[in-house]
UniProtKB/Swiss-Prot annotation:
Enzyme Commission numbers on file: 2.3.1.47
One Pfam family linked to the record: Aminotran_1_2
Protein name: 8-amino-7-oxononanoate synthase
Reaction catalysed by this enzyme: 6-carboxyhexanoyl-[ACP] + L-alanine + H(+) = (8S)-8-amino-7-oxononanoate + holo-[ACP] + CO2
Cofactor(s) for this UniProt protein: pyridoxal 5'-phosphate
Binding site for pyridoxal 5'-phosphate: 108-109, 179, 207, 233
């Protein structure tokens, strides 16, 4: 088979199963409204949960820092790219979340890949929730360790897998809030089981940090759990981009030596780090608390309204509210029907989610108003097939 034939066959297979992904060009993609092709839509696809991407204080912080530092970092943090802005943000994050150290990464994907591939060795085992993010599962597959996946949120299955003999170390991998289902992991029980088997715990709290817990400290803080490795990302609740790993002093020093994504990548712009510090200040403030309370009320309003519909609603109380429709083509038709009525929603299909669970992944944000939720519900009730 030629290279071109391989490419063509893969694309043909995706088209045949209605799983071909595409990008949409937008002129505004975050906030209450999405603007595409000159038309304005209510935006139910954004991860900007607290509406901070449009916050004037954060925008101003980025602009001022760009004037001071320039628009790029100039290199890896190991060479010339670790600025006072990066250092300040790392120290603020560590203090906020109660860890000795925080290390910044350019993305959550890079952070997960770096930590797992740096830590895991040939005789080790990774035990991951089977619905873990692609960055976690891909990192596990790329590492020399054995990967075992436990049934979603099934702590008994997790315990059985950890009990089987392992010559090396074991790492349990889970998420705080699951990106496609919107539900939360039983973190306290998972941590208890991991410690009983002398395993370390890695929690990716991309969709919980900033949005849940006291001062927005996330799902782990809310549940009284402190994993050995906590990954937080900044493209959701923080409204910016990037990520950080929270860990011990020695693990941070280890990652600075062996995490290749950290060593060999240009660090985030200092202006971005400064904007993230400003975002953290908003998250921790009374304004941040009010934004979280408003979002929680909107989620409750949506769930109360959709319960009477024909759609299957998962047990999700986060900003992520997936409506399971099952069939790929039906999910695409439903997303298009909503867009025709002025509501932008995204159809999620395999391989992102398991076969037979295609869905509309609706995300609510603090930027929405109650009337927006009511409009979405009205359109959904009229769009069922």
């Amino acid at each position: 088979m030629s290279w071109q034939q391989r490419v063509d066959d893969a694309l043909t297979a995706r088209r045949a199963t209605d799983t071909l992904r595409r990008r949409y060009v937008v002129s505004q993609g975050a906030g209450r409204w999405l603007v595409a092709n000159g038309r304005q839509y209510l935006n139910f696809s954004s991860n900007d949960y607290l509406g901070l991407s449009q916050h004037p204080q954060i925008i101003r912080a980025w602009q001022q820092a760009a004037t001071r530092f320039g628009v790029g970092s100039g290199g890896s943090g190991h060479i010339s790219g670790y600025s006072v802005a990066h250092q300040a943000l790392e120290e603020e994050l560590a203090q906020w979340l109660g860890y000795p150290r925080a290390l910044l990464f350019i993305s959550g994907f890079a952070a997960n890949q770096a930590v797992i591939t740096a830590l895991m060795k040939k005789n080790d085992r990774i035990v991951a929730d089977r619905l873990s993010h692609a960055s976690l599962l891909e990192a596990a597959n790329l590492s020399p360790a054995q990967l075992r996946r436990f049934i979603h949120n099934d702590t008994q299955h997790l315990s059985r897998l950890l009990q089987s003999p392992c010559v090396g170390q074991q790492l349990v991998v889970t998420e705080g809030v699951y990106s496609m289902d919107g539900d939360s992991a039983p973190l306290a029980e998972i941590q208890h089981i991991a410690r009983r088997h002398h395993a370390w715990l890695l929690v990716d709290d991309a969709h919980g940090i900033g949005v849940t817990g006291d001062e927005g400290r996330g799902t782990c803080w809310q549940r009284g759990v402190k994993p050995e490795l906590l990954v937080v990302t900044f493209g959701k609740g923080f409204g910016v981009s990037g990520a950080a790993v929270l860990c011990s002093e020695s693990v941070a020093d280890y990652l600075l030596q062996f995490a290749r994504h950290l060593v060999y990548s240009t660090s985030m712009p200092p202006a971005q780090a400064q904007a993230l510090s400003a975002s953290l200040a908003v998250i921790r403030s009374d304004e941040g608390r009010e934004r979280r309370e408003k979002l929680a009320a909107l989620v409750q309003r949506f769930r109360a309204g959709v319960n009477a519909s024909r759609f299957t609603l998962l047990n999700a109380h986060s900003a992520i509210q997936p409506l399971i429709v099952g069939d790929n083509s039906r999910a695409l038709r439903l997303a298009e029907a909503l867009r025709q009525q002025g509501c932008w929603a995204t159809a999620i299909r395999p391989p992102t989610v398991p076969v037979g669970t295609a869905r509309l992944r609706l995300t609510l944000t603090q930027a929405h108003e109650a009337c927006d939720i009511d409009r979405l519900l009205e359109v959904l009730h009229g769009a069922g097939e």
